[in-house]
């Protein structure tokens, strides 16, 4: 039936994922184009370490949103690590410094050091996207995620961070209580807010991210794969892990299928793919599976993206 339910006006975030090389960015671009054609204001965002939105739409891109197609409210943004770290420092830098400087005398440059810690970039990426969605500037955000392993780690981080905060709050507060008693003696700074208030705000942020990504009414996850052994195995793994994290996976795109058995090579490929499609159907029981045939053309430029968009949202193969 195509990706019909993605066009629901209540949907605010469409996450497009899969392993590298399966056409994930192409599918995300086609989905974003269709939603823009539906009259919605759309941001197509890529967090892939090697983004290709600029190549697909044949338009230069930098660290600001740019209009991708004339006549439509379709904008694109390729988010680099530098952008994420810069915005993280703007949002959390003062709070981090307030906490750390209450214990020790440090320069504000210490915030840069904290920003390089493992997981910071991924955690803030989710916060950045949720803020984009809830800010109201766009009707819907289509997120071309990084390859599978990176994305799974990213989506687990808010839960892990929240568990750490809940377990660590007592320790932090005990230490802070002791320091409060000797502040005058050692000339430690008094913060404008209590440490507990800052920690609680971080906990609330993680809960907000978790709730949003698990909200099946506003968030859709589209998984892109190929009909080969590796694609099937990774699809099974991703479906299981995403379900374990409470994420709604309602749509699967099987890409690069051979349409016709017009030569021995295509005959063998098609037979192999049909076998794996049956396996994928078993894995995706209850979900919408859309098949996408391999194009003889490079997918770049509005016309080719439009062809893919039509194929993804049409009722038949």
Regions found by a protein language model. Give the residues of each.
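Nucleotide-state-sensitive switch-loop elements of NTP-binding domains
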Residues: 1-22, 27-200
